[in-house]
């Protein structure tokens, strides 16, 4: 979002590099959409409910326009994305928070500007035991791999009707759960969600009492500390890119429930492109007001926790690859060295 600074750098003859905090697949998608807009006047808003599929160079599989990311379905935001993508093409290089073993197709699809994959860049040190001891103690008391963790990011929240559907799904699934719920800000206010004073106000009557032996409802969650805990066996997530990388780093399979920004694309990549996730609703958009019913959520939770042995194996393998990428001689270690060499040589 600081691409205008590139103009200032040009005035002083300083080469510009972009750091891209999302994945390489979405970077390729951004550049592709900008290209077909300029060449064919592509307007994503016209295709959001169609069965059209896009052949995106950074993906192996066709991308359905019905799950276009929320970030490009607003006219003003789409214009901003186009301007940013054009600036990206002028950079001397793009540094991306990903690694070759995860997004090889996307990384290898880039020619100009060069892409440097230096991830996963994560802060995996957490003091969850000091800041949220009651959560960590509860997890300590659960069997290994038995808990599904539901958390939707710093901006993630649902309506009361949707919370009730999630509650019914969890109760009917019978699985142990740790569920972070947040109160949405008022409709006329741009703000982060807050914690509920009493979750009983928005959950089905008697839900907390009926599930007290298997579940815990919390407010804000120390996500890294929770994902690192051996009791966690699955993660229901909004698919923010950091959350995706964290789930892989700790080897926790993910069920995808995207909400905003580029998260629909991330969900597609995890479920269809990479086979590392389970779908709840890849096309869900928070602004749509659609309620995902409890049956659909329950099926996904059961699939995640009961029938995902192959995916679980793949996620565990990716966990090891994510760590290997960063060590001396690893793919991201080498790519970072290439970036440093290029930057130093000007």
UniProtKB/Swiss-Prot annotation:
InterPro entries: UDP-glycosyltransf_plant, UDP_glucos_trans, UDP_glycos_trans_CS. The keyword Transmembrane helix does not apply. The lineage of its organism: Eukaryota, Viridiplantae, Streptophyta, Embryophyta, Tracheophyta. Pathway: Pigment biosynthesis; anthocyanin biosynthesis. GO terms for molecular function: anthocyanidin 3-O-glucosyltransferase activity. It catalyses: an anthocyanidin + UDP-alpha-D-glucose + H(+) = an anthocyanidin 3-O-beta-D-glucoside + UDP. PROSITE patterns: UDPGT. Signal peptide: none annotated. It comes from the Eukaryota. Belongs to the UDP-glycosyltransferase family. Keywords: Glycosyltransferase, Transferase. Expressed in cotyledons, roots and leaves. GO terms for biological process: anthocyanin-containing compound biosynthetic process. In the presence of other necessary color factors, this glycosylation reaction allows the accumulation of anthocyanin pigments. UDP-alpha-D-glucose binds at residues 221, 223, 238, 241-243, 246, 262-263. This is Anthocyanidin 3-O-glucosyltransferase 2. It holds the Pfam family UDPGT. An anthocyanidin binds at residue 261. Its EC number is 2.4.1.115.
């Amino acid at each position: 979002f600081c691409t205008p600074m590139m103009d200032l750098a040009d005035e002083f003859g300083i080469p510009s590099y972009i750091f891209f905090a999302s994945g390489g697949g979405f970077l390729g998608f951004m550049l592709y959409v900008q290209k077909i807009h300029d060449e064919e006047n592509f307007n994503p808003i016209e295709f959001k409910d169609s069965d059209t599929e896009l052949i995106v160079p950074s993906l192996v599989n066709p991308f359905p326009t019905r799950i276009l990311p929320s970030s490009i379905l607003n006219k003003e935001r789409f214009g901003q994305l186009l301007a940013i993508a054009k600036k990206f093409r002028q950079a001397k290089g793009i540094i991306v928070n990903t690694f070759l073993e995860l997004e090889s197709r996307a990384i290898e699809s880039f020619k100009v500007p060069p892409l440097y994959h230096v991830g996963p860049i994560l802060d995996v040190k957490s003091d969850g035991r000091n800041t949220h001891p009651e959560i960590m103690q509860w997890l300590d008391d659960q069997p290994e791999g038995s808990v599904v963790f539901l958390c939707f990011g710093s901006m993630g929240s649902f309506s009361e009707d949707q919370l009730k559907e999630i509650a019914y799904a969890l109760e009917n699934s019978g699985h142990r759960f740790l569920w972070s719920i947040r109160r949405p800000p008022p409709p006329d206010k741009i703000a982060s969600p807050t914690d509920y004073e009493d979750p009983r106000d928005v959950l089905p009557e008697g839900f907390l009492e009926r599930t007290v032996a298997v579940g815990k409802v919390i407010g804000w969650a120390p996500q890294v500390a929770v994902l690192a805990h051996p009791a966690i066996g699955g993660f229901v997530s909004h698919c923010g890119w950091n959350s995706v990388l964290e789930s892989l780093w700790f080897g926790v399979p993910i069920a995808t429930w995207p909400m905003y920004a580029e998260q629909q694309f991330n969900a597609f990549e995890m479920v269809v492109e990479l086979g590392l996730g389970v779908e709840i609703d890849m096309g869900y958009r928070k602004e749509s007001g659609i309620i995902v019913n409890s049956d659909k959520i329950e099926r996904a939770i059961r699939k995640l926790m009961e029938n995902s042995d192959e995916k679980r194996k793949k996620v565990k393998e990716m966990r090891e690859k994510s760590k290997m990428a960063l060590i001396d001689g690893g793919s991201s270690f080498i790519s970072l060295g290439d970036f440093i060499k290029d930057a130093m040589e000007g």
